[in-house]
Amino acid sequence: MAARFEERASKPARGPLDILRWKTRPEPRAADFAELDALRPGVQHGGATALASGDPCAVWIGHATYAFRLGGQLVVTDPIWGSITGVPRLVAAGVPLAELPPVDLVLVTHDHRDHMDLPTIHRLTPGATYIVPLGNGPRIKRANVVELDWWQSHRVGSLEITLVPSRHWSMRMPWNRNATLWGGYVVRGPEGTVYHSGDTAWGDHFAEIAERMGSIDWAMLPIGGYAPRWFMEPQHIDPYEAGRAFVALGARNLLAMHWGTFRLTDEPVGEPPARLRAWWAEHELEASRLWVLDVGEPRALTAER
């Protein structure tokens, strides 16, 4: 399959020789590695009740999966409720799938298996609207699938959803690298605006999103998946860059994601939130603006105007 979106992919691309170097020449571990690696996200059990109430709120399910209600509609991002083949889940999903209220809208940022989990998708509400970047529609196999290019928008009820750029890449199989698009989403609703970055490296797209999309109330940003840095820098931000992205976006609140659910990279499991909190304190940002939620923890979405 042709690499249709090769020119948009993050550079430099990492290939088999880079992976071999990563796996055969690991970097030395810090003295506190074991202590940080033993940490796991906290767990709460109020998420299903909060989502069913109809009030605007967000619940971290785990990894890049959030369930949030805005404009009366239940939105799920990058749904994965189970494990990845060969990679067990470290914490259970924040809301059991059987307890999740009917879903209205599913946003998938790209085709990597930890973001587009087809077994989960096939168990979600069949009548939901699925929004995906260009080329990903045929994989979803649902009736209501909408493909978007960067900066294109689609309206579902009172919500306006725009696909925005990210610095990443796509590959479902070795022969279809960059054959489908990737991105993040800006969701505008009556109560405020949510941004979900998907996977992304650092870049000037954060400032461009702020300029073109206006105020963002809740920025869902990845904070894990960054080590070793020489390998991951072109594709994943680290906790410090997540803080910089928050500032570049001009967002009001940062909702952490993409950590503590799977062991996919080399940093200790509990290191990402520790580093982000340290960066936050160093830059004297208001502590209440940083949301490192427990899995299953509901948080009200109430925008300040």
Please provide the spans of the model-predicted regions.
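Cap/insert and terminal regions of metallo-dependent hydrolase folds
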Residues: M1-K11, L105, D111, T129-I131, ...
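Metallo-beta-lactamase
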Residues: M1-T85, A93-E99, T129-H196, D217-G224, R275-E297, L301-A303, ...
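Short beta->alpha connector loops
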Residues: G62-A64, H112-D114, N136, R167-H168, ...
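A generic local structural motif
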Residues: H63, L90-P96, M116-P119, T180-G184, ...
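Catalytic core of the metallo-beta-lactamase
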Residues: A67-R69, R155-D217, E233-Y240
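Acidic/histidine-rich helix-loop elements
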Residues: P79-G94, S170-W175, A227-H236
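Active-site metal-binding motif and surrounding structural segment of the metallo-beta-lactamase
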Residues: T85-V132, G214-M220
